Amino acid sequence: MASSIICQEHCQISGQAKIDILLVGDVTVGYLADTVQKLFANIAEVTITISDTKEAAALLDDCIFNMVLLKVPSSLSAEELEAIKLIRFGKKKNTHSLFVFIIPENFKGCISGHGMDIALTEPLTMEKMSNVVKYWTTCPSNTVKTENATGPEELGLPLQRSYSEHLGYFPTDLFACSESLRNGNGLELNASLSEFEKNKKISLLHSSKEKLRRERIKYCCEQLRTLLPYVKGRKNDAASVLEATVDYVKYIREKISPAVMAQITEALQSNMRFCKKQQTPIELSLPGTVMAQRENSVMSTYSPERGLQFLTNTCWNGCSTPDAESSLDEAVRVPSSSASENAIGDPYKTHISSAALSLNSLHTVRYYSKVTPSYDATAVTNQNISIHLPSAMPPVSKLLPRHCTSGLGQTCTTHPNCLQQFWAY
């Protein structure tokens, strides 16, 4: 037996919209009435009518509702199934109503979408019910009754199109698959989509792709039936045709020559239909990038004993002392091979002769003015001083203070810091 619940808020203006909602189902559907009232009370005056499944079809023929919520029982009898069919297909006066189906979890994926606009799977949550309100409010063509209007037909207002008309892919049976779904139609919706409908769109797209794949297999099997030699009494089902094709191809490969087989293979490879998309080759790093990575790895494990091993690959800064006769604007070039070999030993005992200094090396050596316990690339970069190469190479003795001309490998006791210009740490 149907019962009505009217939710009227105070301070409602005379033109406040009205929504007539029909709740259909067993006794448990009554618990939804309070939730539905709270959700729709902010946008309109809500009138809720509760009815069981058997009386709902007759009620829909006599009254007009803006929204129908049908809660499908977890176990359906033949009588209840027939009543649900009448509700879904016997909507004479409520063809433009919003139909929401609440489907039990054990019926998930079994009930088709014909006659429904939104399908909610149990267990119900506030988020799912809020999607119904959002779906209703975002549809620009929804129509509700007002106190000063007797009906949308009399006002000449366009009736709300059923969302199932927008979707356009619902079948005509409760537990049937959709013909339009197999055709892949109705993938675009004008109204905003809930999460359930987005998943349904993805499902439809997958179904259309699967249909296309099956059509291709069917077409190829028909072609194979034609290409295979005729054998009286041969089976024509797809599996038998494929097995016969495999035997036939094996027989042909044994008879043809390798040269002809190579031509066939080349022809198949040239056909892009049977080739996968080529992967983009990975680009190798530039030589400069590799060199920088090598230098960084060497410098990260720097030690004073290996300080001069990579001078030809590293720029070092130098500052002249007041006792020097000539400034460090004069450049020094060191051959990479000889400098690296001579620098392997102890820096304080290694002697570099003047003949070792030449203009043949392509690497500029810059000297650092003070000893650094652990190499700091940032500090060296911040103290970088450009050195311009002159046209002629001055003697090595001119680069040293007067009291240190005896040799590079000897320690100066008078000026202990002078040799620190020439040994990099």
From Swiss-Prot:
Main location: nucleus
Keywords: Cytoplasm, Developmental protein, Differentiation, DNA-binding, Nucleus, Oogenesis, Spermatogenesis, Transcription, Transcription regulation
Segments forming domain bHLH: 201-252
Localization annotation: Nucleus; Cytoplasm
InterPro entries listed in its UniProt record: bHLH_dom (IPR011598), HLH_DNA-bd_sf (IPR036638), TCFL5/SOLH1/2 (IPR039583)
GO MF annotation: an example: protein homodimerization activity
CDD domains: bHLH_SOHLH1_2
GO CC aspect terms: chromatin; cytoplasm; nucleus
GO biological process: cell differentiation; oocyte differentiation; regulation of transcription by RNA polymerase II; spermatogenesis
Pfam families on file: HLH (PF00010)
Subunit architecture: Forms both hetero- and homodimers with SOHLH1.
Role summary: Transcription regulator of both male and female germline differentiation. Suppresses genes involved in spermatogonial stem cells maintenance, and induces genes important for spermatogonial differentiation. Coordinates oocyte differentiation without affecting meiosis I.
This protein's name: Spermatogenesis- and oogenesis-specific basic helix-loop-helix-containing protein 2
